[in-house]
């Protein structure tokens, strides 16, 4: 898969969706070739439905995709990667919700995504974590990044890196995204030289 040309960006909200004050919305208006991957029921549905929605978006085009996932969507992306493949160049995985932890209620949407897949992702990725996220301890973020073969970025005290964090356009996140795209392109050039 060539990632030297055009890319498309898929914004994948977590449980409950990304409200109007979420950085996802700010990015939607400024990223080229950007589209939403929204669940029919962002507060419900099954893991299989979430994964199928991601698969439909990824395979809708042969243009390589950069997945930009938040919270539960990060875990859905990891589940997608264990069962499917498609033209994914990279993934920015922001505040993956640790669905294996005790905060998730037994009958909640989050528990439907257990266990968190701990297999390497077949594309370049960055996990972004906050130091005071109630849904993801830094040590667990480190475990996810290691298992997934991702780089870990600690973004400071920004809660769950969602609307409540008041990140607006989240310029630091755009830096991570630029780095991720650059890494994906460099890796592709390395493969082309082999």
Residue ranges and their predicted role:
Residues 2-63:
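Active-site catalytic motif of lipid deacylating hydrolases and related acyltransferases
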Residues 10-14, 70, 129:
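The conserved beta1-alpha1 loop
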